[in-house]
Each structure stands twice: as structure tokens, then as C-alpha cells.
Swiss-Prot record:
Keyword DNA damage included in the entry's annotation: yes
Name of the featured protein: UvrABC system protein C
Organism: Limosilactobacillus fermentum (strain NBRC 3956 / LMG 18251)
Similarity field: Belongs to the UvrC family.
Single GO molecular function: DNA binding
Domain UVR: start-end pairs: 197-232
Gene coding for it: uvrC
Record-linked Gene3D superfamilies: 5' to 3' exonuclease, C-terminal subdomain, GIY-YIG endonuclease, UVR domain, UvrC, RNAse H endonuclease domain
Taxonomic placement: Bacteria, Bacillati, Bacillota, Bacilli, Lactobacillales
Length: 603
């Protein structure tokens, strides 16, 4: 249900194409989308029921803004720009720096062949992408041995090592004719485009010649080169009748997850496959279009000669933006490739769901192990507490929540304790935080947890049970989490006699208890450090004559730390409305404190 503010904005939406930016309560952009009709698209989020990631996103939306464009093409381009600029949480995001390895023949007088992750408009010849750097390196090493170009830094007055190895044409000590480079480059391009027959013929002749001249080591080396072609290049299945470099995309949507498959067809072979899985907010077609445009807006911008897409995507707009023919084949081998990509997308997503189900069963099983050992009904929600202080100073408590074995961080709570004690009183701290937490749940009529875990022993357990049973009239199981001498999770305590449960340390249940204990301890310590640091800063300022709470807050808000206040000019301190005398006193006092602290650190 949209707020009154959002309802007012929804009524003002235009019937035009453009982009919309969803924002949360902190004005952060959490989703960017595009639409042919902004009014219809944006209103659909708030006028229909949703599940999964869409529901989570809509629940967070506190505001939105729209940008009207003159055409659908312009909105496509703007959406990609906004996604890459703001990196919204709920969008599919591809890093611009993510690229693939390519083989490059440089556009120089003495060209070299090398591997690169950046494709530039520099007149060079690029081939790829390769599945990984190792595959590209293997191919380059083969080419350097069979079709040498330049492999040194250029003229140096003497032959380089690679010239003696037959892997450099010798520009290191002589002028290599451009025609010789042209012949080699032509052979390399032919080989990279899958024409291996001529290369094999040449290598076979060389091998036989070397063997006839009793150069058996050389013959064995050439034999290995032939073997490379047979097992690395020719073993790949030919899946196309032509050698047009093309990329192929297909997808499958189920249960709010989008599975994408990308096939890179080079030399009529499947050179590389990429698979991606995303939880999605928009329609599969909208998300897929966004993915494709981001895909080609990364560092590697080498486009294929053709892109194949399934039905339902805006082929014309994508073609106009990328400048590459975009087609949806209806029959033949190209259609078969699209169908194969779809089948792989389905298999990939089903595998994801199986893994998710295994994780769910593992965490659910861990919960059952705990409740079985405790003799309790199956539980789903655990709330765990820990306290933190320094010799009783700045006492705090923290609570974490685990639902079905997973942390529910939005439900975590922090408490500054107000109970005044002469020292760290674990029982008093426990009584206060337990009363505050569960009296509030009672007042707000919210559900109670299935069990409460205290990071401590019988003292905390008894204090918690006393408050729950005698003050609030609640019957929630309270369990103690105890640690060994190494401060590691050792066991659980339960019951009126706080007996040891002896949970199997190799079980999933024990592992879950470890996670809960570590998480609540981390959360409490982090919060205490923040409170203690803030209190320490305030105390140092409070010791200065003329500095009251208002002045102290002004200083901390403006400068953020004692050190920054200490080095700030008096004029900047006075600019906060502090008089000259007090400003100078602040400077002198803080610098004096710093000197004392510095001197004591050397004692």
C-alpha cells in the first residue's frame, strides 16, 4: 500500500517513455528501471500484489523520481548509464571492468602477438574471447613457435634469444620486410579462424623433413605441435555451418530467479559459455535487455558480427544501440543453438534450486537437532543476547535473531543499559534487557521467539527466567551458551539445574550454536566500541571549562573527532558560535591532553 505522499506522486506520472529511480528512506537509489509508459509501469508496483524480491523492493520504496526521454532507445541508454552510476541494490549489475582474454596482433611496423583484456580501436586484430587466460596463453605460445613475428623489444644490434629459438623474425638485429610479416599475420588469422588443415600439412612436412635429417628432437617438438591442434582446436565440436563470429543469449525465469546463458560462437565452435543467475524485480524481458546492454558496455567492447536472441526482446532497439545485426531464428541450426542455451539455463536454475533446498534442509535440520537435544518442540526463531562493558563502564546489550537457522539482521536490536551498578553485574544487565525486550513485544502484541539463548552461564539464565516468568508471565525456554578456556563454543546449558546438553560438536546443530554465539558477541562488541568511543570523546570535551552539552555536540558534529578539533584553527572553532576565550581554551586543553598522552606512551 503506497503512502499518501507516494499516491500524490503516482497521480502526476506522465504517459511518456523514460526511466524511474526508486529510493529508500535514506534517499538511496535502490532500483532503476525503464518504461515505454512511465505512468503504467511505476503505478503497477504499488497497485498489484508481489512476492519475493519485488515485494522486498516495493516495501523499501519511500520515494521515486522519473526522467522523461524522447524515445525508447534513449531510455535504454539512460537506464544503463544510471545503473552503472548508482549501482542500485535490486538491479542486475555487471562491472564495467569485467572482461575476457583476447589474443591481439598489434598494428605496428614489427607486430607482436599477445594476450589482452582490453579491446581498443587501434587498428590491431583481436580474436576471442577465450574461456580463460590459460587457454589464450596456450594458443599464443603455439603461434609464437609456429608463426613467429616479433618477440623482443625491437632493434638492439644483436639477435635475441627468441630468434635463436625460432620464435622471432629478427627485428632485433635487422630490418624484417613488411611482406614477411604480412604472410605470417595472414597465416595466424587463418589458423585462429579455424583453418587448421593447411597448418597441419605444413607441420607434417616439417616433421618429416626433420626426421629425415635425423633431427629427432626437432621432429618430436613439431609432433607435439600437431598434437596440440588435434586435442585443443579440432576436438571442439563444430556446431555451425559458417564461421561468422556470433553471440547467443537465452534465459529461463522461475520463482523470481532469472537464469541466463551466453554462448560465444567462434570458428563455428562454441568457444566459451557464460552463465549467470539473478533474483529479479522487473519482467524477464526487461531484465534480459538490461543485462545484454550492460554486457556490451564493459571494458571489452569487441562485438560479434551477429547476435541471436529469443522471442520477446526489443531486437530493433538493441540493434540500433549496438550497431550489430540482432536476429531471432525460427528454424535450423541457429534455432537449435538457442534451444540448447534455453535447456542449459533451465538446468542451471534447477541446480540452484536444489542447492538452496539443501541449504534449507541443512539449517532446518540444525534447528531440529538443537530442539531434539533440548526436548523441545520444533522451533523456528531464536533470539540471543550478550552484554559488553569495560569494568562496568558504558554497559550495553545486543540481541541477534536467527530464523530457521539464518540470521535475520533487520530484526537485530541494540540496548544502552541504564541500570546503575557499582561494577559489571551480569544479572542486573540481563534483567534489564530481557524486561525491555519482551515487555515491548507484549505491549505491541508481537510474536515471541521459540527460545532465548544467553551468551553466558547459570547467572544470566536464572536472571532471564526470573523476569520472563515472575514479571512478564511468559514461558519461553532459556538456554545458556558456554565457552571453553579458549573462548570457543563448548556446550549448551538448559533446565532448572542448568545441566549440560552435550550437543555433538560435529553436528550441524553445534555449528549453528557457534554461529549464533559468534554473531551476538560480534554485534555486542561492535556496538560497545562505538558507544565507548563516543563517550570518551564527550568526556574529554566536558572537562574543558566553558564547554557544555550544546557546545560539545556542535564540535563533534562539525569536526567528528578530538584530533580534528585539536588541529583546527581557532577561527574555525569560533565559526560555530563559540567565543574567542572558549575557542582558545579548547585548543590549549586538547593540545595539552595530546601532549600528556604522547608523553605517557613513551614511558
Amino acid at each position: 500500500m503506497a503512502s499518501e505522499y507516494l499516491e500524490h506522486k503516482l497521480a502526476l506520472l506522465p504517459d511518456q517513455p523514460g526511466c524511474y529511480l526508486m529510493k529508500n528512506a535514506n534517499a538511496q537509489i535502490i532500483y532503476v528501471g525503464k518504461a515505454k509508459n512511465l505512468k503504467n509501469r511505476v503505478r503497477s508496483y504499488f497497485k498489484s500484489s508481489h512476492t519475493g524480491k519485488v515485494a522486498a523492493m516495493v516495501e523499501e520504496v519511500a520515494d521515486f523520481e522519473t526522467i522523461v526521454t524522447s524515445s525508447n532507445k534513449e531510455s535504454f541508454l539512460l537506464e544503463i548509464t544510471l545503473i552503472q552510476k548508482h549501482q542500485p541494490y535490486y538491479n542486475i549489475k555487471l562491472k564495467r571492468g569485467t572482461g575476457y582474454p583476447y589474443i591481439k596482433i598489434t598494428n605496428e611496423r614489427d607486430p607482436i602477438i599477445k594476450i589482452t583484456g582490453q579491446v581498443k580501436k587501434d587498428g590491431a586484430y583481436y580474436f576471442g574471447p577465450y574461456p580463460n587466460v590459460y587457454a589464450a596463453e596456450e594458443t599464443v605460445h603455439f603461434i609464437q613457435k609456429v608463426f613467429p613475428l616479433r618477440r623482443c623489444h625491437g632493434y638492439q644490434g644483436r639477435p635475441c634469444l627468441y630468434y635463436h629459438l625460432g620464435q622471432c623474425l629478427g627485428c632485433c638485429f635487422k630490418e624484417v620486410p613488411e611482406e614477411e610479416y604480412a604472410v605470417q599475420t595472414k597465416r595466424i588469422k587463418s589458423f585462429l579462424n579455424g583453418n587448421t588443415a593447411q597448418v597441419k600439412k605444413q607441420l607434417t612436412a616439417r616433421m618429416e623433413r626433420a626426421a629425415g635429417q635425423l633431427e629427432f628432437e626437432r621432429a618430436a617438438e613439431i609432433r607435439d605441435q600437431l598434437h596440440y591442434i588435434e586435442v585443443t582446436v579440432e576436438k571442439q565440436k563444430i556446431i555451425s555451418n559458417d564461421k561468422t563470429p556470433r553471440d547467443l543469449f537465452n534465459f529461463y525465469l522461475d520463482k523470481g530467479w532469472l537464469s541466463i546463458q551466453v554462448f560465444f560462437i567462434r570458428q563455428a565452435r562454441l568457444m566459451k559459455r557464460e552463465k549467470r543467475l539473478f533474483p529479479v524485480v522487473d519482467t524477464a524481458e526487461e531484465e534480459m535487455t538490461s543485462f545484454i546492454l550492460q554486457f556490451y558496455n564493459r571494458r571489452n567492447k569487441l562485438l560479434p558480427k551477429e547476435i541471436l536472441l529469443p522471442e520477446g526482446l526489443p531486437n530493433q532497439e538493441i540493434e540500433e544501440i549496438l550497431g550489430v545485426p540482432v536476429r531471432t531464428p525460427q528454424r535450423g541450426e541457429k534455432r537449435d543453438l538457442l534451444d540448447m542455451a534455453k535447456e542449459n539455463a533451465i538446468l542451471s536454475l534447477n541446480e540452484k534450486f536444489r542447492l538452496l533446498e539443501m541449504d534449507r534442509q541443512k539449517t532446518t535440520g540444525a534447528m531440529k537437532e538443537i530442539t531434539d537435544e533440548l526436548g523441545l518442540p520444533t522451533g523456528h526463531v531464536i533470539e540471543a543476547f550478550d552484554h559488553s562493558h569495560i569494568q562496568g563502564a558504558d554497559p550495553v546489550s545486543a540481541m541477534v535473531v536467527f530464523v530457521n537457522g539464518e540470521p535475520a539482521k533487520k530484526l537485530y536490536r541494540k540496548y544502552k543499559l541504564t541500570t546503575v551498578v557499582d561494577h559489571a553485574d551480569e544479572a542486573a544487565s540481563t534483567r534489564e534487557v530481557i524486561f525491555r525486550r519482551y515487555s515491548r513485544l507484549l505491549k505491541e502484541e508481537k510474536p515471541m521467539p521459540d527460545m532465548i539463548m544467553m551468551d553466558g552461564g547459570p547467572i544470566q539464565m536464572e536472571a532471564a527466567k526470573d523476569v520472563l516468568e515472575n514479571q512478564l508471565g511468559l514461558n519461553i525456554p532459556v538456554i545458556g551458551m558456554v565457552k571453553n578456556d579458549k573462548h570457543q563454543t563448548a556446550d549448551l546449558l538448559y533446565g532448572d539445574d542448568a545441566h549440560h546438553v552435550n550437543l555433538d560438536p560435529r553436528s550441524q546443530g553445534f555449528y549453528l550454536v557457534q554461529r549464533i554465539q559468534d554473531e551476538v558477541h560480534r554485534f555486542a562488541i561492535t556496538y560497545h566500541r562505538k558507544v565507548h568511543t563516543k563517550h570518551s570523546l564527550s568526556s574529554r570535551l566536558d572537562e574543558i571549562h566553558g564547554v557544555g552539552p550544546r557546545t560539545r555536540n556542535k564540535l563533534l558534529k562539525a569536526f567528528g573527532s578530538i584530533n580534528k578539533i585539536a588541529v583546527a584553527p581557532v577561527e574555525e572553532i569560533r565559526a560555530l558560535g563559540i567565543n574567542q576565550t572558549t575557542a582558545q581554551l579548547i585548543k590549549v586543553s586538547l593540545q595539552g591532553q595530546a601532549e600528556v598522552k604522547k608523553g605517557s606512551s613513551h614511558d
